[in-house]
């Protein structure tokens, strides 16, 4: 599934340090020759493509990034130290453009690729630079040059790691709103979700995964019924499918097992490879089930559904059971990322563009 994630940042490279006016102090000589050193270079701002990242979510919480300025020159021919550089980790596929003009400045297309997005200013000259046969005791110096400052727009075509499957009103939108920054429309009637919603689930610093809420499927979706047929193809590039089931439907005549079986049938009809993709069962709306009935209802569902895979019991509304599920998803996604070998193929984010060339 392809979405566009974006963030705006301000970067400032370090200013160069100022040059120094200084003279040697020797015995019987009040002023020796000039020995004022140059200022140090300001720190650069680099960006590096990190294959372990898949969103720009961290840059929404930290917009300003500044490198250190260079130190000033000193006497005894001592140059100022260069300012510390900073390196910003960004996902592979990030497009960096000028926020004011829209001009594309850089693209990070390969893992480990490093670019300079703001250059530090050069250090100023000390007075030793101005010594000449005519001027043996120069008092001139120059200030450091300012570092580059830029307002940048970061743009990333995001691939969803996790896709949510389920019948309309199974609670997928409530789940994605509970665990991520997405705010889909939520209501008590089917087909609330009319378009895919993307949510970034933050597990920790530089630890996140992307989850996509697909419009609810109905029986016959693989042949074009309902709203879900046009979105089934987007699930093919996800790393994990979560099959969300409403375990407590308002209509008591509705059989959750029959609904879940219909969803699995649509997957099998649409694409055998998609059907074989890792899939976990998420039994939702347990807050609507009396506590003394939960275990029996879950056991009955799993038995009738003939399910052998992982099962998670949650209430997206109260967030009960959501945290263990989030941690398990992250571990699964991370393991798959590490197992995938870097191959020289067209990045899926740009597959459409490459096909049209």
UniProtKB/Swiss-Prot annotation:
* Span of domain OBG-type G: 160-334
| Residues the entry annotates as binding Mg(2+) | 173, 193
CDD domains the record matches:
Obg
Can you name one GO molecular function term for this protein?
A: GTP binding
Q: What is its EC number?
A: 3.6.5.-
Q: Which GO terms describe its cellular component?
A: cytoplasm
Q: Which residues form the Obg domain?
A: 1-159
Q: InterPro entries recorded for this chain? A: G_OBG, GTP-bd, GTP-bd_Obg/CgtA, GTP1-OBG_CS, GTP1_OBG_dom, GTP1_OBG_dom_sf, OBG_GTPase, P-loop_NTPase
Annotated positions binding GTP: 166-173, 191-195, 213-216, 284-287, 315-317
GO biological process annotation, one example: ribosome biogenesis
Q: Output the SUPFAM superfamilies linked to this UniProt entry.
A: Obg GTP-binding protein N-terminal domain, P-loop containing nucleoside triphosphate hydrolases
Where it mainly occurs, coarsely classed, is cytoplasm
Give compartment(s).
Cytoplasm
Q: Identify which cofactors the protein needs according to its UniProt entry.
A: Mg(2+)
Q: Which family does it belong to?
A: Belongs to the TRAFAC class OBG-HflX-like GTPase superfamily. OBG GTPase family.
User: Assembly state and interactors?
Assistant: Monomer.
Q: What does this protein do?
A: An essential GTPase which binds GTP, GDP and possibly (p)ppGpp with moderate affinity, with high nucleotide exchange rates and a fairly low GTP hydrolysis rate. Plays a role in control of the cell cycle, stress response, ribosome biogenesis and in those bacteria that undergo differentiation, in morphogenesis control.
Protein known as: GTPase Obg
Source organism per UniProt: Paracidovorax citrulli (strain AAC00-1)
Whichever gene encodes this chain, its name is obg
């Amino acid at each position: 599934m392809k979405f566009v994630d974006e963030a705006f940042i301000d970067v400032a490279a370090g200013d160069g340090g100022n040059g120094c006016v200084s003279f040697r102090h020797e015995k019987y000589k009040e002023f020796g020759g000039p020995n004022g050193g140059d200022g140090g270079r300001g720190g650069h701002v680099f960006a590096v493509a990190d294959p372990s990242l898949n969103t720009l979510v961290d840059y929404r919480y930290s917009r300003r990034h500044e490198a250190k300025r260079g130190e000033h020159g000193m006497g005894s021919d001592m140059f100022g130290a260069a300012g510390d550089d900073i390196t910003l980790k960004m996902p592979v596929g990030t497009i960096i453009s000028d926020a004011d003009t829209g001009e594309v400045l850089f693209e990070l297309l390969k893992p480990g690729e490093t670019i300079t997005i703001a250059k530090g200013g050069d250090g100023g000259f000390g007075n030793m630079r101005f010594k000449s046969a005519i001027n043996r005791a120069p008092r001139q110096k120059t200030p450091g040059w300012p570092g580059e400052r830029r307002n940048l727009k970061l743009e990333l075509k995001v691939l969803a790691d996790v896709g949510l499957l389920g019948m309309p009103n199974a609670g997928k939108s409530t789940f994605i709103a509970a665990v991520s920054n997405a705010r889909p429309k939520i209501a008590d009637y089917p087909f609330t979700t009319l378009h895919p919603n993307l949510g970034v689930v933050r597990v920790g610093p530089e630890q996140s995964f992307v989850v996509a809420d697909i419009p609810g499927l109905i029986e016959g979706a693989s042949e074009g019924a309902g709203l879900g047929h046009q979105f089934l193809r987007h699930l093919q590039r996800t790393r994990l499918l979560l099959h969300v089931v409403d375990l407590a439907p308002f209509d008591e005549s509705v059989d959750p097992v029959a609904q879940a079986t219909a969803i699995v049938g649509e997957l099998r009809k649409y694409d055998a490879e998609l059907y074989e993709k890792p899939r976990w069962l998420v039994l939702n709306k347990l807050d609507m089930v009396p506590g003394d009935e939960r275990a029996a209802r879950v056991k009955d569902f799993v038995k009738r559904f003939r399910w052998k895979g992982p099962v998670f019991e949650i209430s997206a509304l109260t967030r009960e059971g959501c945290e263990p599920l989030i941690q398990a998803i992250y571990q699964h996604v991370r393991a798959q990322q590490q197992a995938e070998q870097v191959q020289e193929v067209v990045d899926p984010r740009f597959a459409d563009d490459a096909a049209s060339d």
